[in-house]
A protein has these predicted regions:
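PAPS/PAP-binding and catalytic site of the sulfotransferase fold
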Residues: 13-27, 100-103, 181-206
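Glycine-rich phosphate-binding loop used to anchor ATP phosphates in small-molecule kinases
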Residues: 68-98
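PAPS-dependent sulfotransferase catalytic domain
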Residues: 68-75, 120-201, 258
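Short His-Asn-centered micro-motif
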Residues: 7-8, 87-91, 112-113, 184
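PAPS-dependent sulfotransferase catalytic core
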Residues: 1-74, 131-153, 211-260
Length: 268
């Protein structure tokens, strides 16, 4: 079994795409994983472990790698014992792309979406389901609209900031040999063709998916976070574009602040 890391921004359609991929018995797929946080805790604690001082750097690195890779594979096999690929998902793995490449020697999948649609999706959730939210209100700056201030807050939040800065670094440093970008918009238009590209990247044989019979993955949404509200369509034919509510000042901010993103992925 190979381990592949998926660390996309929220509201990019990654849950929909993984729900489709789960049709393929070659995959072990789950929702958000707790393993990234355990990895960081493990690294912190092992650095304080005195018995590790008896090992050389190479010995300790090899044992850590073996322990964690087998642990990740074991987690995946518990999901699907016959799987060839385990997709380990947590947005914050984007903070560890060097670890993934040089230590785990694994590949990364990142789902992309127009940032205006990401912001629009969050805006609609926050405005329509604000009863449990207090992170994205209480703005009192007169020169900027409330919507623009909310958008600033969205993109300052770690859930977006960490994956997005990782994407910029991948572009700046040309780290495309182990990263596959899949655009949500392309998937909606040509789903099988886009997944065929993914299979080629993962060195798997193509699989014919049923895009009219999509079953949602088991998951528990949290009412406390706008990022975790999912409504997966059962068929791509039923896919509807979200009502667009962003104002011109927000659109200008996103297209200016993230010009590099649009030039690389949406320069059409």
């Amino acid at each position: 079994m190979n381990v592949v890391f998926e660390c996309s921004m929220p509201r990019t359609g990654s849950q929909l795409i993984k729900s489709v991929l789960k049709q393929n018995p070659d995959f072990a797929i789950q929702i958000d994983s707790p393993l990234h946080f355990k990895w960081h805790k493990f690294r912190k604690e092992i650095s304080l472990e005195p018995t590790c001082s008896t090992l050389t750097k190479e010995e300790l690195s090899n044992r850590m790698r073996g322990f964690w890779l087998e642990g990740l594979k074991g987690w995946g096999k518990a999901i699907n014992p016959k799987a060839k690929v385990f997709i380990e998902h947590n947005r914050f793995w984007a903070d560890d792309i060097d670890i993934i490449k040089h230590f785990f020697n694994c590949k990364i999948i990142i789902i992309l979406r127009d940032l205006k649609d990401v912001a629009n999706s969050l805006e609609n959730i926050v405005k329509n389901h604000n009863e449990f939210n207090n992170d994205f209100n209480n703005f009192y700056v007169y020169k900027n609209s409330a919507q623009l201030q909310r958008t600033h807050k969205f993109f300052e939040h770690e859930m977006i900031r960490i994956p997005l800065t990782a994407i910029k670094r991948i572009i700046d440093e040309g780290m495309f040999d182990f990263v596959h970008f899949l655009k949500y918009e392309d998937f909606i238009k040509k789903p099988q063709q886009e997944l065929d590209k993914l299979y080629k990247f993962l060195e798997l044989k193509p699989y014919k998916h049923d895009f009219n019979n999509i079953k949602d993955m088991d998951r528990i949404d949290t009412p406390m976070l706008p990022y975790g509200r999912h409504s997966i369509v059962s068929s791509l034919n039923k896919h509807k574009k979200t009502n667009f509510t962003l104002k011109e000042d927000v659109i200008e901010f996103l297209e200016t602040e993230f010009k590099w993103y649009y030039e690389r992925f949406y320069n059409e």
